[in-house]
Amino acid sequence: MSRKQAAKSRPGSGGRRAEAERKRDERAARRALAKERRNRPDPGGSGCEEEFVSFANQLQALGLKLREVPGDGNCLFRALGDQLEGHSRNHLKHRQETVDYMIRQREDFEPFVEDDIPFEKHVASLSKPGTFAGNDAIVAFARNHQLNVVIHQLNAPLWQIRGTDKGSTRELHIAYRYGEHYDSVRRINDNSEAPAHLLTDFQMLHQDGANKKEKMKTKGVDVKDGLRDDVEDAVHKVGSATGCTDFNLIVQNLEAENYNIKSAITALLQVNQGTGNDAEENHEPGDRVKQRGPSREEAGSGRRLSGNQGRNEGRMETSEARASPAEESKAHKSQLPKVTNKQRREQQRLEKKKRQEERHRLKALENRNGSRDTGRSEADMNTQVTLVKTFAALNI
């Protein structure tokens, strides 16, 4: 038996060979990445470095980071493999599977091949390692694996290439840089070789809406009845606090104050106070004349009859004559403006601030009521990342 045959027959030799191939592939990837960085075009001096820093800052704001892959022509399949499996060692397999899918679905992809290149030549070239792959390969990969691919670009909205219309679809996030290179996108603290599980806020909104509808169906909640009860309760509280019995007036004030009960009560009290002041102003001149006339007559009669009547009666009428100016002064003060313009503006500012706080509180309650199911495991929550909601869809 030769040495080669003996080596093949030894137990565990296949595992060592696979490990050696894996290490060789990793070394080749590192060398290719270093070479790509050295040979990367640098228009305008440090333009590429600035682009990388800007891209990193953009992703960091979303809680994400770049995981670079070698720019050896296999970068797209390396980045997709890192997202799908946690590493990029199977990029050749992903490339071949993508090409095979394009051949099977030729009628979908042939119209998008350049006119002067036959489809057979295009897929034959794409199947070779190191051939740059474009959007048609991303669409084929997404459809073949029944998932969505989200592409990040610097200072641009996200592109979502949908491989399926099913809900709760897995997403692979990659970055397109320098106009020719793809990298993998990971959570900012993810340094593992586990598959990436990123989910955009766009998809979370659809899931939350579906979950909320399902909850409402199961609980039998009638939204209209609930809103009607809330309005009636608010009207009752405002009416009890202000003494107002005009239902329409209360509802108008509630609507004007965005159903802020405290603000509506304040507004109604101000309206009632203004109405009362107007009534006092309309009736007060006549009342003052009436008060002044009898007071003077009583004072005069008190002086005229002081000799004929007892001293006590004179004192009583004199005291009444003295009391009427005090009452007149009190009534006059009650009609003076209670607050200055500055105080009124400050009061309006505080009321506006209260209304804004109430609106924020209502929004917070809505968000809390529409939160995700508490039954979702903590591991699943750790794999969620909230991203921007701006999307453009690329469909072939």
UniProtKB/Swiss-Prot annotation:
The keyword Hydrolase applies. It catalyses: Thiol-dependent hydrolysis of ester, thioester, amide, peptide and isopeptide bonds formed by the C-terminal Gly of ubiquitin (a 76-residue protein attached to proteins as an intracellular targeting signal). This is OTU domain-containing protein 3. GO terms for biological process: cellular response to nutrient levels; negative regulation of phosphatidylinositol 3-kinase/protein kinase B signal transduction; protein K11-linked deubiquitination; protein K27-linked deubiquitination; protein K48-linked deubiquitination; protein K6-linked deubiquitination; protein stabilization; proteolysis. The UBA-like domain has no influence on ubiquitin hydrolysis. The active site is at 72, 75 (nucleophile), 181. It holds the Pfam family OTU. It comes from Mus musculus. Glucose and fatty acids stimulate CREBBP-dependent acetylation, promoting its nuclear translocation. One of its GO terms (cellular component) is cytoplasm. The keyword Hydrolase applies. Keywords: Acetylation, Cytoplasm, Hydrolase, Nucleus, Protease, Thiol protease, Ubl conjugation pathway. Residues 229-269 form the UBA-like domain. Residues 1-49, 275-381 are annotated as: Disordered. The lineage of its organism: Eukaryota, Metazoa, Chordata, Craniata, Vertebrata. PROSITE patterns: OTU. Disruption phenotype: Knockout mice develope worse obesity, dyslipidemia and insulin resistance than wild-type mice when challenged with a high-fat diet. The modification N6-acetyllysine is found at residues 65, 121, 128, 219, 290. InterPro entries: OTU_dom, Papain-like_cys_pep_sf, Peptidase_C85-like. Residues 64-188 form the OTU domain.
